[in-house]
Amino acid sequence: MENQFQDGKEEVIEAWYMDDSEEDQRLPHHREPKEFIPLSKLSELGILSWRLNADDWENDENLKKIREARGYSYMDICDVCPEKLPNYEAKLKNFFEEHLHTDEEIRYCLEGSGYFDVRDQNDQWIRVAVKKGGMIVLPAGMYHRFTLDSDNYIKAMRLFVGEPVWTPYNRPHDHLPARKEYVEKIINRGGTQAVEAR
C-alpha cells in the first residue's frame, strides 16, 4: 500500500531541512542554501504519504483502499483558520509545541496547506509542506509539530483507528512505549523501514 498512489506526490508534499530562525513559524524556514530532501528520506523515518483526489474524496476508491488496508475506521474533517477554529491562536500554539502521540497521526489535506515539522535521526528539524491532495501518516512515537503556512488555512481530514484520540505528549516523553518502539525501529536502525501500524 505504501508504494501505491505515488504519481505526482512531489507536487503536493515537499520536504527540506529547516533553519534555526525564531521568525514567524508560518514562513518556510529554508536553510541557506536551501536543502530539499527526497520523499524517500521521509519513508526512512517511518512516514507514509500519498497523493489522492481531494476534489472527489467522498468517492475516491484509492482513499477507501488505504482506509481498509490500514484500519482507519473513523474520519472527521476540520478547518484550521482564524474564522472557523474556536480559540485559534491557542490551538495553533498547542499544535506547534513539539510532541508525540501513542498512535499514528493521519492527515489528508482537502484544501489549503500547512507544515508538519519532524525530527530526523540526528534530531534535526525537517519541514514537510503538505498541500491539497497530500495525505501523510506520522508514526506513533515520532516527535513532531504542526503549523499553518502564511495562507493561514487548511481543511484536513483526520483519520483514526477506532475511536478518535488526539493526546499530545510534549517533549520529553522518551519513556513511553510508543517512543521506545519508534527509536528502536527507526532511529537505532538508521531508518530503513516504515513503521507498521499495529
UniProtKB/Swiss-Prot annotation:
Binds either 1 Fe or Ni cation per monomer. Iron-binding promotes an acireductone dioxygenase reaction producing 2-keto-4-methylthiobutyrate, while nickel-binding promotes an acireductone dioxygenase reaction producing 3-(methylsulfanyl)propanoate. It is found in: Cytoplasm; Nucleus. The keyword Amino-acid biosynthesis applies. Pathway: Amino-acid biosynthesis; L-methionine biosynthesis via salvage pathway; L-methionine from S-methyl-5-thio-alpha-D-ribose 1-phosphate: step 5/6. It is an enzyme of class 1 (oxidoreductase). It comes from Oryza sativa subsp. japonica. Its EC number is 1.13.11.54, 1.13.11.53. Fe(2+) binds at residues 99, 101, 105, 144. Belongs to the acireductone dioxygenase (ARD) family. Ni(2+) binds at residues 99, 101, 105, 144. Its cofactor is Fe(2+); Ni(2+). One of its GO terms (molecular function) is acireductone dioxygenase (Ni2+-requiring) activity. Induction: By submergence in root tips and lateral roots of seedlings. Down-regulated by water deficit. This is Acireductone dioxygenase 2. Catalyzes 2 different reactions between oxygen and the acireductone 1,2-dihydroxy-3-keto-5-methylthiopentene (DHK-MTPene) depending upon the metal bound in the active site. Fe-containing acireductone dioxygenase (Fe-ARD) produces formate and 2-keto-4-methylthiobutyrate (KMTB), the alpha-ketoacid precursor of methionine in the methionine recycle pathway. Ni-containing acireductone dioxygenase (Ni-ARD) produces methylthiopropionate, carbon monoxide and formate, and does not lie on the methionine recycle pathway. Keywords: Amino-acid biosynthesis, Cytoplasm, Dioxygenase, Iron, Metal-binding, Methionine biosynthesis, Nickel, Nucleus, Oxidoreductase. One of its GO terms (biological process) is L-methionine salvage from methylthioadenosine. The keyword Metal-binding applies.
